[in-house]
Amino acid sequence: DAFDFVQDEAEKFVRKNGAGSENRMIVSFSGGKESTATADVVIKALANPKITHLFGNTTLEFPMTIDYAERYRKNHPLAEFRIAKNTDQNFYEVCKEIGPPARMMRWCCSMFKTGPITRVLNRKFGDKQILTFYGIRKNESVSRSKYSRVTENTETVKIQKQTVASPIFEWKDLDVWLYLLSEKVDFNDAYRLGYDRVGCWCCPNNNLRAQFLSRIYMSERSEKWRSFLVDFARQIGKPDAEEYVDSGKWKARQGGNGVAAAGDVK
């Protein structure tokens, strides 16, 4: 049927693009449903349970994601499971210096995700051109719909010296769930709680539904973050700080706005 074709096509894609790259290949593992499905497709297509997985722990992951990553690791004992984490900087301390991240100023990605991941890759592979199997789908967002299924050293590849191949690029949301459930693949419990996407719990790109759920399931973190944002709004002179935060206007910030060090952000 149609889904069998989708699954078979993804496995053929992995075998074709993975040929000759066995010693310089990784699966990018985020703990989300797409990366979980991708990892399973890659392992089965290559019949290689030892493939390296790289998990970027931004320190802002859902607690459920950390639990799931550990569970995944135990369920795949032959896989080399590496963790990239920024242990030098604290998210809140950086926010105090340069202001919280916003949709147009996501400094957190380079500092807490791509930077640590690049360091791990450099330690493992040096100057080798590596192949990364990535769990992105073009239906996830407008920006991702502009990606190519195989991309090499372009601006859309955030970490250089790698070819990014996306086996499930053409899959719809339903295809991902059909795969996970039919193949009996364990997945992140955050989805069972109602989240439709899994990432950083305080990301300015999170929708209202995710924010609502986080107030329920991560109430202490959510309240601490809201208090910080309200204090920040007062610091930069917003007349109604609570309304500025609760309406989501903080996400649209585009410049330093009263934060001296914000000009250092690249």
Where are these regions (language model features)?
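Nucleotide-activated chemistry modules centered on ATP-dependent adenylation/adenylyltransferase
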Residues: 1-266
